[in-house]
Amino acid sequence: MGWTKRQLVDDAFGTIGLSGYVFNLSPDQQQAALRQLDAMMATWEARGLRIGYLMPSSPSESDLDQDSGIPNQCAEAVYSNLGLRLGSSIGKVPSQDLKVIAHQAYQSILTKYGVSMP
């Protein structure tokens, strides 16, 4: 099994300094982050970037403990970009390092999957 959706969410919070093991993230916070993950992955897919993410049929069907379906080499792009989204939704300014890592990782998977963006 690869990355679970919970692992992606936890690592995304970690990128913005809110690791669950330190900050005791509530189930509501984790579910909200999962919805953002699902929405981000739906957007990526709509742009032609299909990396195998297991999309739920509806937001209420999404499960944190489900395998994400993504290959290991895509995990950093997913959790770092999710970290950017989570940070902006809670008013936390992401570090410049996170912005660079998220951008570079995203560009790497665009190249790997042969997707060109305008």
Residue positions per predicted region:
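Conserved short "hinge" loops at termini or chain/domain junctions
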Residues: 1-72, 89-101, 109-117
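Elongated alpha-helical scaffolds
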Residues: 72-86
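Aromatic-residue-lined binding/catalytic grooves and analogous aromatic/hydrophobic interfacial grooves
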Residues: 105
